[in-house]
Amino acid sequence: MSGKEILGKARTVLIIDWPSKDVPEALTLAGFQVFVKGGPGPMDYERYELDHGKPVSSHLGRPPDRADLVYSYRPVGELVEVISLAKTLHAHTIWIQSGVSISGEDDPKGCWLAEDQLGPARSMVLTSGLDFLSEPYIADVARELQRAA
């Protein structure tokens, strides 16, 4: 399934450990409910919402009740925990940040998982019963969906 198809079916996205605001803001502007797990504590969750057309975040202090999609920026060694959280939230898909842009070219925003780790990561996620995606950059897909709307 493509990134556009996956986002087209999702309404709620949990982002794990994203280091900047570009992804949650792009998803929020595209109409998604966005939550971010972003700190070392077990209850370090934020919610993104639109306030007068601008994305703003507020401390939630707990995981969301559910998420259709989990977008992770964590190393493969932590994937078991990411899968467990995704299943708890009834997510359908784990999308892991890759180094490929929506146009299919290398993306300077980075590749958290090296190419040799993507295969094992994909296997772990698929074996758990969830869908797996590693490209393209999710913010680019959200912006494209927003423009098409």
Name the predicted role of every residue range.
Residues 23-26, 81-86, 120-121:
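A short acidic, amphipathic alpha-helical/loop segment
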Residues 87-119:
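ADP-ribose/adenylate-binding Rossmann-like module
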